[in-house]
Amino acid sequence: KVLEGAENIGIKLTHVYGLTEVSGPASVCAEQPGWDELPADQRAQLKRRQGVPYPLEEAVTVLDPVTMQQVPRDGETIGEVMFRGNIVMKGYLKNPKATDKSFEGGWFHTGDLAVMEPDRYVKIKDRSKDIIISGGENISSIEVEDALYRHPAVLACAVVARPDPKWGETPLAFVETKAEAT
C-alpha cells in the first residue's frame, strides 16, 4: 500500500541496501522493464528485494557461510549476504579478531541471511541472530511478521524466539491490532 500510495502522487521509490561497514548503498533494487505494468502487489514483491550490486561494488552474493560456495539461484536456499569491493571497509578499528572473522574466505560477512532469486536479485530473509530454530527447522522471524502484516487487523507486530523444552525454541508474536479491529 505504501508503494502504491507513493506512486499515486508521483513519487518513484527505489530500494537500496547498505551497512555501516560498506560506504553508501551496497546494492540497489534496479527496476526492470515491464515492472511498471504489473499489478501493485507484484511490483511491491519485486521492489522490496535488496537487489543487485551497486555500480561501485565489485560483488554482492549469497554464499553458504560454511563452504563459501554460492547458493543456488532458486529463491529458496538460504545463505549469507556477502560483499567484496572497494567500498567495503578495511577492518574494525583496533579489533583485528572481529576483522578476521568478518572477512573469512575473502568476503565481508554481513550476518544477513538471504536467498538469491533466479534473476540474480538478493532477497533478505532474516538476520542470522534472529533465526528461530524450532525442532531442527529454521524459522524466519521476518517471514512470520510478513504473514501477520497481511492480516487486515494487524497494525504492528514483532516475532521473537521463546525457549521451549521440547522444540528448543518456538516463535512468539507480539501483535498490535488496529483500533477498528474487533
Q: PLM features: what roles do these ranges have?
A:
Residues 2-16, 20-121, 128-131, 144-145:
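Conserved AMP-binding/adenylate-forming
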Residues 85, 90-94, 113-182:
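AMP-binding/adenylate-forming catalytic core of the ANL superfamily
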